[in-house]
Amino acid sequence: MLKTFSIGGVHPHENKLSAHQPIVQAEIPAKAVILLGQHIGAPAKPIVAKGDVVKVGTKIAEPGGFVSAAIHSSVSGKVAKIDTVVDASGYAKPAIFIDVEGDEWEESIDRTETLVKECNLTAEEIVKKIADAGIVGLGGACFPTQVKLCPPPAFKAECVIINAVECEPYLTADHQLMLEHAEEIMVGVSILMKAVKVNKAFIGIENNKPDACLLYTSQSPRD
């Protein structure tokens, strides 16, 4: 039998002073440093070089292995260099440095605010688009999402479980995202269900977020 944790443990005091503050758009910086290891697994491999012009949404690095993720530019401008930078953990990591110029976006990006609720893609096409987009989880590991959606052939998923539990006592971004973008999240859940070919999903929300619990209970169809 697997060992389990005994009942108890440490529950740090919550510090949610930023709760219920609206999400705001950050100002465009003069320079951007985009790490190539923003996820668990192998770092992404750069596909741009010094002097290349990039736009918002330009793919600048491709996955470096099966457990890896593509990376896209979040700014427009010119690649200044590819070098190492000391990250928040104190380790030198490879990164792409960009001198920001303007706010040009890739033409393939749909910037309209209309929410498309119907997905006509196959499960395989959905997984490929997720991989191409470099989507990763919001947890500390930033696990590449396409890997989660590709279980071994001998195993079949029974349901989708959405972990909407904030993983540390100061974090409030997930809570606010759930409140401001509930409809988009529910559409995303339905797309994930199609990707793994199941008809059931569960969303786990902490009991310290009664507003989110009420909101998603009202939006979720029940069997």
Where are each of the predicted segments found?
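Conserved small/polar residues in nucleotide/adenosyl-binding loops
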Residues: 216-223
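Conserved hydrophobic positions within beta-strands
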Residues: 77-79
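Internal alpha/beta scaffold segment
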Residues: 119, 176-215
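Acidic low-complexity segments
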Residues: 86-143, 154, 210
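Short, Lys/Arg- and Gly-enriched loop/turn segments at beta-strand edges
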Residues: 63-73, 91
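Gly-rich Lys/Arg/Thr-decorated short loops/hinges at beta-loop-alpha junctions or inter-strand turns
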Residues: 162-174
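N-terminal, Lys/Arg-enriched amphipathic/low-complexity engagement segments
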Residues: 1-43, 47
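Short, well-structured beta-strand-loop connectors
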Residues: 49-62, 81
